[in-house]
C-alpha cells in the first residue's frame, strides 16, 4: 500500500510515523515535507519530475504526484489545502483521501459561522458576539469585560489569530491588530469576542466516516510563547520586536500591568493523555459536543474533527465547552498523541474512506507522551536583533545533536532542511517527544534529549507538563 501524507511540519511527520508502523503500508510519501520527513522507515519526500512539491498550497502538483505515483490513500494534515479543495480534487481522480471536502471546512474557516452553528444546535460554548466593525467590538469589550476576554480572528490564521486577554487594554489592542492593522489579512475582517473560561483546556480529536464517529485521542496543548516567569525571554522578544531597549524590571512591570502580552503561538508543546479526561469525561465530550456536530452538520464530513474543549467544573462535574472547531488534527497535539496509537493507522484510514469505521477499534497505549517544541528564538545577525518565533526570526541556522537526541526521544521535524547537515527553516524547528509510564518519565526523556540539540537562537519552554497531575 502506498500512502501520501500532505503536510510540511511535525504533525505530518507524526502522521507518517504512525503509518510506518502498519504492515499494510510499503511506501509513504510526504508532500511537501521537510528535512526531517525521512527520519522514519518507509518515509520519503514526494518528488514530481525530479523536484519537490513546492508547498501545501500546490494543489495541482500534489494531485499530479498522487496520480503518477498511483497512491492508494492520501491523508491531509493542515487546514489550508483542505480549504483549497484538495480532497475534492483527489476524489475526482479516484484517489481516496482522509479529510473533509472544501465546503465542510467552514467549521474551521469561519469562527463566527462556527460559533453561531454551535449555539443553534445547543453545544455548550462561552458567551460571545461577532463583529465586523472594530469600534462596536471595542464598545462591547468595555461593557462586558469581566476577569478576562478572548478576541479571535474569524478566518484561518495558522493558529495565531487568538488573543487571550487579561485586561481591557490588551483586548482593545487585539481588535486593532486584527481588524485595523490587518495582521492576518482578510481573516481579520470579522472577529469573535468571547468570555474567557477558566478550567482545563484540551485538544480533543475524533475520527468520523460521516456516519460513525469515534474518539481519536486528546492532548493538553501549550500555546503561550514563554513560560510565565521567563521575563528574560520576553525582554529579548520585545526588544527585537519594537527595536526599543527595555530593562528586565521594565518588562516585568509592563507585563504585570497588562501593557504587553505573552503572545500566542501555533503551539509550544503538548501532553497526552490528560488524567482529567477519564472514560466518563470522554463519553460526555462525545455526547455533548462531537456527536451533535456530526449529526447536525448538513455537509459531508469525513476525517478528523478537532474541537478545542475547556473542561469547566459545574456542580462537581467537568462540563465540556467548545472554544473553537478544527477540521484536521492538532499540532503539536498530534505529535504527543499519535506515538501512543496502537491501532493500525492504515486500517483506520481505509475504514474512514470506505464508510466502515464502525468495524475498527481505536486503541491507544496507556503511556504518557510529553512533546516540547524547540523554536527559533531571539537572535542578533546581519539584520540586527530579530525577536524570534512567533514573530520574525532568522533561518538557515546549523543544527547539531539530532542523531544523539534520537537515542532518548522521538524527533519530529517542523522546520528544517537537510544540506550538508541540518539547518533551520522555520519558527518551530523540532518537536521532541518523550514517552514513559508516567508524565515525569516522559518529561525527563524529552528534556534530556533537548539538551543534546543546539542551534543559534534555540529556545523552548521548560514547564511543559508540569501542571498536569499524575
Swiss-Prot record:
Pfam families in the cross-refs: GARS_A, GARS_C, GARS_N
UniProt-listed SUPFAM superfamilies: Glutathione synthetase ATP-binding domain-like, PreATP-grasp domain, Rudiment single hybrid motif
Record pathway: Purine metabolism; IMP biosynthesis via de novo pathway; N(1)-(5-phospho-D-ribosyl)glycinamide from 5-phospho-alpha-D-ribose 1-diphosphate: step 2/2
Cofactor note: Binds 1 Mg(2+) or Mn(2+) ion per subunit.
Top-level class of the enzyme under EC nomenclature: ligase
InterPro entries: ATP-grasp, ATP_grasp_subdomain_1, PreATP-grasp_dom_sf, PRibGlycinamid_synth_ATP-grasp, PRibGlycinamide_synth, PRibGlycinamide_synth_C-dom, PRibGlycinamide_synth_C_sf, PRibGlycinamide_synth_N
Domain ATP-grasp positions: 115-354
Gene it is expressed from: purD
GO molecular function, one term: phosphoribosylamine-glycine ligase activity
Annotated binding of ATP, by residue: 142-203
Database matches in HAMAP family: GARS (MF_00138)
Swiss-Prot/TrEMBL keywords: ATP-binding, Ligase, Magnesium, Manganese, Metal-binding, Nucleotide-binding, Purine biosynthesis
EC code: 6.3.4.13
Similarity comment: family membership: Belongs to the GARS family.
Name listed for the protein in its UniProt record: Phosphoribosylamine--glycine ligase
PROSITE patterns: ATP_GRASP
PANTHER family the record matches: PHOSPHORIBOSYLAMINE--GLYCINE LIGASE, PHOSPHORIBOSYLAMINE--GLYCINE LIGASE, CHLOROPLASTIC
NCBIfam families: purD
GO BP: 'de novo' IMP biosynthetic process; purine nucleobase biosynthetic process
Catalytic reaction(s) noted: 5-phospho-beta-D-ribosylamine + glycine + ATP = N(1)-(5-phospho-beta-D-ribosyl)glycinamide + ADP + phosphate + H(+)
